[in-house]
């Protein structure tokens, strides 16, 4: 596997179930997880698991988590609060506030009429690092998929705390127990046909594999195929970048008194409060500004914080691999203009049955790649 995001880890998990198969995961970064990683600047985003993540939940149910329970069992229901002009913060029963019965119909109509975001965040007044964070970046099909997903998903779950602690680290331990080789800081620079196999080149030399599954995010995928002189139709576009903050709170704050996690959403600022770890993770989607002065003032106001913040980390998410895909899916069987024996593709931007760029889509695309490999190579029955 090239890449250790959700799709790469899923592919490694399922392929490692087969006898006589050696599995290696190559990750270009110094740590694993892809966009589900946690680096020195904090979380990539508030990690939210929709209630229809059926395939991901199935896999997480097999992975032992921090406390001996499965990772799936450790997920917590997240309360969702939306701000209204008449009642202040209201806990709602639907992810999409315009469909939440707790908000009066008259106010929902007002909200719908008032929601006229500038098509370009750059057109808005104030300091904003949300590069391409605009509706113009969404393809019409992408917008339709997003709307459909908002309507049909009513609730969601979150991790008790940091993504690496509760998701990625347990998953890596599980893969190592399965005998999977995990190699970080191994950027792949070239792919080439080698007979019926695939030659993979990194800084450490060239290795030959029977099968290679590329799970890199679209910009990295395009760069790799171009560098390998492999003719393809993938396009490095349709990506949006959103700034995230990871904030450690004083444990005496009133917002932490309720032990259950909660998501506060207002004016394009989305705040996931994780009381079990005295912290919150903030994602600026359509916020008018993303600079610390503006965002931290919003967080203080929305959460009614009284004390100094313990620590603040800001992740601007400007690298190509940190984007969110909002373009049109690419079919894996049409990505290459000429088929290449032994080369497969997976990832949340690869065509799958989930409507938006999400962990569930990454899993479904990985499962499709695994099915194709099993068919093409007549793999032995799983253990």
Over which residues does each language-model region extend?
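Glycine-rich FAD pyrophosphate-binding loop
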Residues: 16-39
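Conserved Rossmann-like nucleotide-cofactor binding loop
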Residues: 7, 31, 219
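Mid-domain catalytic core of redox enzymes
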Residues: 18, 186-293, 302
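Beta1/beta-strand and adjacent pyrophosphate-binding region of the FAD-binding site
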Residues: 1-7
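Helical element adjacent to the flavin cofactor pocket in flavoenzyme catalytic cores
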Residues: 146-202
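A short, Lys/Arg-enriched amphipathic alpha-helix followed by its capping loop at the start of a domain
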Residues: 10-21, 177-178
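Mobile amphipathic helical/loop "lid" adjacent to a hydrophobic cofactor/ligand pocket
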Residues: 50, 56-145, 150-153
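Conserved flavin/dinucleotide-binding core of flavoenzymes
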Residues: 260, 266-383
């Amino acid at each position: 596997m090239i890449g250790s995001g959700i799709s790469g880890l899923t592919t490694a998990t399922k392929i490692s179930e087969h006898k006589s198969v050696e599995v290696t995961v190559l990750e270009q970064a110094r740590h694993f997880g892809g966009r589900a990683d946690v680096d020195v600047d904090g979380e990539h985003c508030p990690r939210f698991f929709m209630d229809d993540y059926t395939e991901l939940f199935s896999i997480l149910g097999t992975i032992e988590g921090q406390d001996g329970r499965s990772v799936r069992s450790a997920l917590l229901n997240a309360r969702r609060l939306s701000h209204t002009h008449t009642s202040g913060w209201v806990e709602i029963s639907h992810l999409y506030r315009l469909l939440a019965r707790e908000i009066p119909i008259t106010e929902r109509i007002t909200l719908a009429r008032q929601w006229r975001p500038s098509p370009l965040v750059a057109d808005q007044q104030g300091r904003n690092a949300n590069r391409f964070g605009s509706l113009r970046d969404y393809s019409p099909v992408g917008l339709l998929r997003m709307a459909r997903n908002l309507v049909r998903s009513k609730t969601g779950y979150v991790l008790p705390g940091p993504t690496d602690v509760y998701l990625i680290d347990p998953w890596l331990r599980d893969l190592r127990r399965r005998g999977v080789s995990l190699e970080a800081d191994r950027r792949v620079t070239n792919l080439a046909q080698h007979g019926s196999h695939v030659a993979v080149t990194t800084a450490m030399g060239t290795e030959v594999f029977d099968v290679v599954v590329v799970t890199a995010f679209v910009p990295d995928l395009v760069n790799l195929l171009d560098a390998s002189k492999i003719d393809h139709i993938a396009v490095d576009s349709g990506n949006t970048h959103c700034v995230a903050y990871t904030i450690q709170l004083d444990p005496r704050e009133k917002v932490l008194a309720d032990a259950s996690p909660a998501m506060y959403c207002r004016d394009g600022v989305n705040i996931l409060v994780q009381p079990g770890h005295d912290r919150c993770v903030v994602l600026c989607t359509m916020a008018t500004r993303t600079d610390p002065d503006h965002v931290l003032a919003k967080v203080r106001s929305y959460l009614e914080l009284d004390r100094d913040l313990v620590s603040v980390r800001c992740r601007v998410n400007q690298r190509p691999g940190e984007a969110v895909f909002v373009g049109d899916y690419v079919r894996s069987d049409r990505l290459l203009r000429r088929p290449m024996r032994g080369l497969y593709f997976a990832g949340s931007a690869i065509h799958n049955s989930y409507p938006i760029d999400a962990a569930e889509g990454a899993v479904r695309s990985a499962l499709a790649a695994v099915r194709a490999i099993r068919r093409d190579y007549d793999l032995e029955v799983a253990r």
